[in-house]
Regions:
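Residues in the short beta-alpha loop(s) of Rossmann-like NAD(P)-binding domains
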Residues: 184, 208-209, 274
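Intrinsic-disorder-associated, low-complexity terminal segments enriched in Asp/Asn/His/Tyr and depleted
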Residues: 7-10, 37
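Rossmann-like adenosine-cofactor binding region
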Residues: 225-312
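Short internal alpha-helix immediately C-terminal to a glycine-rich phosphate-binding loop
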Residues: 158-179, 185-197
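N-terminal amphipathic/hydrophobic targeting modules at extreme N-termini
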Residues: 12, 19-26, 30-31
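N-terminal ligand-binding/catalytic initiation module
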Residues: 28-156, 164, 174, 320, ...
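Adenosine-phosphate binding glycine-rich loop
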Residues: 54-56, 281-374
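NAD(P)-binding Rossmann-fold cofactor-contacting core
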Residues: 197-220
Length: 374
């Protein structure tokens, strides 16, 4: 990683206001803090907490979401980040779920972060979302906590932004048909942000449970102000679509998305935890793009895990990471007839960048709580 520029972010703060408020902090930089410690002076440290309702109250716009995630990609492309590959915790296979732990550092923002997200496929039976997350932001110079955010919405928003930004560089500009499989939390943001770029003439959606896909379709139609076609099977959803997004929630890998359904010149964006792809899918691709090669080349989960293990997706067959395309180091789509696959596993950098943007907006609006840490 390149040596970061000097930053003096307002990160390690000593509260100058009463607990429970978000008034401006008094900042002690590391040297001054050490001198105070040597003099025996007590240092009181608070961090900001943003709950789910707080995050909702921020009313993040599409532009704010896309801008934050794109900023993270630019920093990644310029070598101004540190990404540690995600790790997993499976408490008990009988629970049909696991935890993902994502870690990273974004130098231009002067913040490091760690997100823990639970991924439980049967949570709908308990009236709970399948994915629930917490994001911790830290001062990278001292390790002191800066903020704790409910990151469930962050996960959904940044995933949709990554899908849409990938498509902006990799899909045909005249793409008019979207086929979207899956109705998980991030699915809404996939479709919403993709439609912002492409203004689709036809949007098809499918998911395993009828009640889920119909509710999803109605939600999209209401918010987008256009018809959404709810279909009963994968083939009807996928065949002939200009952009295909596979965001299914399978309990185990199963080749439900057939290679023969993919149209020449299409963009395919698979990111289900359990693979729904045939091994032959990579054979019809002109370009393979990922969010971070270091992250996708190892691990136990992911849409193209079998393709990596079988040697079909390697560093040699990889065209680029999306960040390289965003900053112009590598080309995106070059021909109308190119068939392209973009696999994103989910970047810690996107969580950190969007979480940081939310924290800054919360400070401007006076949203959130200041909690005592030390």
């Amino acid at each position: 990683m390149r040596e970061p520029r000097e930053h003096r972010p307002d990160l390690m703060s000593v509260a100058a206001s009463r607990p429970g408020t978000l008034a401006g902090p008094v900042v002690f930089w590391a040297g001054e803090r050490a001198r105070r410690h040597q003099r025996g002076a007590a240092v009181t440290v608070h961090f900001t907490y943003l709950s789910g309702p707080d995050v909702d109250a921020l009313a993040m716009t599409d532009e704010e979401i896309l801008g934050a995630v794109e900023g993270g990609l630019v920093a990644q492309g310029r070598g101004q980040t540190v990404i540690e590959p995600r790790v997993h915790l499976v408490p008990d296979p009988a629970y049909r779920g696991h935890f993902n732990v994502l870690r990273g550092y974004v130098a231009p923002l002067g913040v490091a972060g760690m997100k823990i997200v639970g991924d439980y496929v049967d949570n709908y039976l308990h009236g709970l979302p399948s994915e629930m997350a917490l994001l911790n932001l830290f001062d990278p110079r001292t390790g002191m906590p800066v903020a704790l955010l409910n990151a469930t919405a962050i996960t959904d928003m940044r995933t949709g932004a990554m899908t849409a930004l990938g498509a902006r560089h990799l899909a045909r500009r005249e793409s008019r048909i979207l086929g979207h499989v899956g109705a998980r939390g991030s699915s809404y943001w996939n479709v919403r942000l993709l439609d912002r770029f492409f203004r689709f003439a036809e949007i098809r959606v499918h998911s395993r449970r009828p009640e889920s896909r119909w509710a999803f379709g109605e939600h999209l139609a209401r918010d987008l102000g256009k018809p959404v076609r709810v279909v009963d099977d994968w083939e009807t959803c996928v065949r002939g679509a200009d952009i295909v997004v596979e965001a299914s929630r399978l309990p185990e890998p199963a080749p439900l998305l057939r290679t023969e359904w993919i149209a020449k010149g299409a963009l395919v964006v698979p990111y289900g935890t359990m693979s729904a792809l045939e091994l032959s899918l990579t054979d019809v691709m002109d370009k393979l793009v990922v969010d971070d090669w270091g992250q996708v080349r190892a691990g136990r989960f992911g849409a193209l895990r079998a393709h990596v293990d079988a040697g079909r997706l390697t560093e040699a067959t990889l065209h680029a990471e999306l960040c390289q395309i965003v900053i112009g180091d590598r080309p995106g789509r070059e021909r109308e007839d190119e068939t392209i696959l973009f696999w994103h596993r989910g970047l810690s950098l996107s969580d950190i960048a969007l979480g940081h943007a939310m924290l800054e907006k919360a400070r401007r609006l006076g949203i959130g709580q200041s909690l005592r840490y030390a």
